[in-house]
Amino acid sequence: IEELDTGMRNQFIEKFQEIKVEFDKVFKELFGGGRGTLELEEDVDILEAGIRIISQPPGKKLQNMMQLSGGEKALTAISLLFAIQNLKPSPFCLLDEIEAALDDSNVDRYAKYLHKLTKNTQFIVITHRRGTMAAADRLYGITMQEKGVSTLVSVDLIEDQLDDKPAKQE
């Protein structure tokens, strides 16, 4: 049991440090600067310690995540989610309006970063934001033409690149 406990502690510390470094990288990209870091609660067993998320958006002082505006909180949380996703991509991910509190410029950075992650993960994103929809490959919408009857609408946004390629010359 002691050997298992030591292994868990070592693995936790290693993964925590990896996530901490990646979180700062993603934070800087999504915020266009600033700094994001993670801290473990002190004077507590590491396997039971809380984790503080510390954020410093560009032009602001370093502060606990709970002191941020709604949009800053959302973008900080998204940064942490994407940092973990970068380190250990899951095959698919469902995001339900996580960018709702963001302003348009932050939605654009979020959508561009999300699109980069689609190389390793399929995302199902529920959104009302045009900036997020613009980064999608395919949109599905639900409309109600008549009361009680829902209709599914699908729009494929991937352009057919075959017509754009120059003809081969021999």
Per-region residue spans from a language model:
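Terminal ABC-like ATPase head and other globular end-domains that cap long coiled-coil arms
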Residues: 1-170
